């Protein structure tokens, strides 16, 4: 909190007075010098590394799910594409009839994850350095074709990347960095303007470097440590001035009239797109409140390995999931951080917003 962190309060005051240029003008030299002094290796940060950086406005990734338009974050984040692919692959199934207390639903959800993440590992990265076939990856025809790989009766032996329209470079899949240290919040103001915001410093306390009241990130670890395989480049390999791939999936859902009906997102590294898609399915297909949807258990496919939330309803489905082919399955203690706002329209037309936070965490959210 700024009141307990005098250096941070001073930084916020400077930003309020000078705007974001404060980072690039007044702070740049001291910032670079501090980082360089704490970095004994070659390739130390210099002032030009700070002053040459520019935040970029990027196009959202949007797709249709049932009667809704779902928009999320594009590359270098993989979240928007992954959410769109998972939802699109599941659209041919009657999820409403299955419900959240069905082993079949969780099996189908796992399969959609595997297929979406296979594409993610191969294609997703910084578009300034590698052509990412975003339009092809979320094209309804491509997603429908990928959906045909999903069987309600049997798990895939192995999920492999597809070949969407627009592929220009032969790539190789990289390794999967471990991501955490992320924050997400959602806001809707009195005029209906909505923000779904995800930010991260990667690891817990980032790099551990503390400057002017805030921690600095260690996002370098979000790159693939393998630059190439079999002579083919990895999309998320390390390169100078490149932005690493992330899993962030801030999402806004619109109805057919173009009105915002759900604002959602999460923290939690590679589980973020899964948490987000799960919440959307909960509201759209299962008719749950946002709080109930956010509270649904987590199940995640890390390649052939499946982990699910310990003590959840999924625990009772473990044997069934094994019979379906998910043989490498185990429980874990979930520490999830999703939240959402859902529009609620009363009979008299009055609009309010339901506030939802993950029940597995302590902080309270409010609607005023």
Residue map of PLM features:
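Short, well-structured alpha-helical segments that form the helix of a local strand-helix-strand
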Residues: 26-32, 101-117, 290-300
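Extended C-terminal subregions enriched in glycine
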Residues: 191, 241-244, 276, 285-333
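Active-site rim segments in enzyme catalytic domains, especially the processed small/beta chain
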Residues: 38-46, 188, 193-257, 262, ...
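Short, small/polar residue-rich loop motifs at catalytic or cofactor-binding pockets
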Residues: 57, 179-182, 246-248
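Structured, charged N-terminal subsegments at the starts of enzyme catalytic cores
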Residues: 33, 37-111
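Internal maturation/activation junctions in enzymes
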Residues: 5, 43, 92-200, 331-332
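Non-catalytic, conformational "gating/processing" segments within enzyme and secreted inhibitor domains
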Residues: 1-40, 120, 127, 154-160
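Alpha-helical support elements that line or immediately flank enzyme active sites
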Residues: 17-24, 29-35, 88-91, 266-288
């Amino acid at each position: 909190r700024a009141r307990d962190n005098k250096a941070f309060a001073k930084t916020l005051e400077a930003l309020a007075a000078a705007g974001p240029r404060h980072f690039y003008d007044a702070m740049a030299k001291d910032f670079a010098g501090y980082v360089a002094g704490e970095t004994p290796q070659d390739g130390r940060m210099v002032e030009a590394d700070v002053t040459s950086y520019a935040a970029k406005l990027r196009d959202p990734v949007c797709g249709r799910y049932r009667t809704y338009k779902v928009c999320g974050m594009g590359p270098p984040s993989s979240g928007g594409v992954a959410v769109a692919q998972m939802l699109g692959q599941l659209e041919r199934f009657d999820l409403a009839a299955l419900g959240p207390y069905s082993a079949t639903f969780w099996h189908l959800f796992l399969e959609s994850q595997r297929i979406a993440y296979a594409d993610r590992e191969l294609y997703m990265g910084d578009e300034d350095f590698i052509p990412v076939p975003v339009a092809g990856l979320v094209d309804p025809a491509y997603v429908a074709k990928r959906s045909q790989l999903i069987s309600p009766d049997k798990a895939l032996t192995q999920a492999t990347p597809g070949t969407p329209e627009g592929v220009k470079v032969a790539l190789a899949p990289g390794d999967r960095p471990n991501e955490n240290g992320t924050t997400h919040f959602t806001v809707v103001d009195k005029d209906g303007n909505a923000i779904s915001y995800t930010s991260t410093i990667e690891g817990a306390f980032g790099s551990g470097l503390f400057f002017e009241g805030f921690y600095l990130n260690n996002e370098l670890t979000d790159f693939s440590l393998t630059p190439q395989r079999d002579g083919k480049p990895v999309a998320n390999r390390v390169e100078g001035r490149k932005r690493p791939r992330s899993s962030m999936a801030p999402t806004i859902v619109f109805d057919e009239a173009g009105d915002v009906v759900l604002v959602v997102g999460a923290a939690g590294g590679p589980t973020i797109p899964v948490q987000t898609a799960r919440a959307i399915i909960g509201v759209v297909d299962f008719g749950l409140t946002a709080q109930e949807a956010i509270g649904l258990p987590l199940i995640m496919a890390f390649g052939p390995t499946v982990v699910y939330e310990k003590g959840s309803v999924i625990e009772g489905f473990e044997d069934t999931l094994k019979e379906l082919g998910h043989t490498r399955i185990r429980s874990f203690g979930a520490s999830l951080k999703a939240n959402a706002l859902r529009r609620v329209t009363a009979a008299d037309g009055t609009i309010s917003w339901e506030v939802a936070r993950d029940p597995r965490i302590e902080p309270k959210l409010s609607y005023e």
